[in-house]
Amino acid sequence: MNIKEYIKQWAESYKTDLTENIMPFWMEHGWDKVNGGVYTCLDRDGSLIDSTKSVWFQGRFAFICAYAYNNVEKNPMWLEAAKSTLDFIEKHCFDENGRMYFSVTAEGKPLRMRRYVFSETFAAIAMSEYALATGEQKYAERALQIFKDTQRFLTTPGILAPKFEESVQLQSHSIIMILINVASCIRKVINDPKLTEQIDESIAKLKKYFIHPEFKCLLETVGMNGEFVDTCMGRTINPGHCIETSWFVLDVAKQRGWDKEITDMALQIFDWSWDWGWDKQYGGIINFRDCRNLPVQDYSQDMKFWWPQTETIIASLYAYLATGDDEYIYKHQRISEWTYAHFPDAEFGEWYGYLHRDGTVAQPAKGNLFKGPFHIPRMMIKAYSLCQEILNKEV
């Protein structure tokens, strides 16, 4: 394989697919030019099947529009859509205490509040990316404010409803990993010691509590001191989630001059998670595994969702950038060939989200409250940038 040519071809493919397929699909079918914001509950052909708006995706869509503008093409429509969606967020998606809703109506009336803070994290990265695109410092300051509010919600007893009764003392991987990415995004536009502290704290927790060498995995749920919890929940491995974490950590390692300890930790997470996640029979990254190889409780455990594949594409390129090891190019080739053979919809555009284990389509909708314009375009933008970095490094 001529790696340089391989990377060049993928760079062009990511840019073309993003600008001619993915972004136009959501600009035409998702962006609400009447109320602002974005619809994500779309059928295969882009027609609206539910006008409920996911607040996660208000932030995610605004982020993607600004992220594409900053890294791929200075398309003014993308910036306009980002601004429209940020305005919708500010007008409709916060309650009087600064908490964000999970879903709202088309016009922005509140529908549901949930006990976690993912809406806040996505709004924060949207504000920071828009600040980077426009130079408007007020958005950077707003991003930092939302981030600090999120930290307060997580650490102040009584603000967030507990997931379990007091007798159950567990901690989850998801919020710890996402805050690495949120803080990394905001640090691009504003300096505050809380951001670096959060990154350091999250990485330390992953290393101390969630990485379990006895199973060669990163667990989703552990005890408060990292104890292995021998239940269905405690044994769960989410390979796609762990692989996403690996590239978030590689991002930090790169920012710190390829800090060896952090780089090695990220590569270990990726390598282990690939081994758990790659389906040797059918290909692709599987949803869930049990660290003791017992039956997995989640009913979607053997399905192939869109986002673990996109995160693996990013992580394999990032691992190659970090190491120059051809093994990661071959992993990129394997995941890319499988993903692009099964997920894209050649007739109506965009990608399917949910496949059976063998790669057949489970349901054809292009979006819902959890799938929309985020993982796929983020992959294309990040992978395009990584390809450029790899090519520049090899010159």
What name fits each language-model region?
Residues M1-V395:
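Glycan-recognition and catalytic cores of secretory/periplasmic carbohydrate-active enzymes
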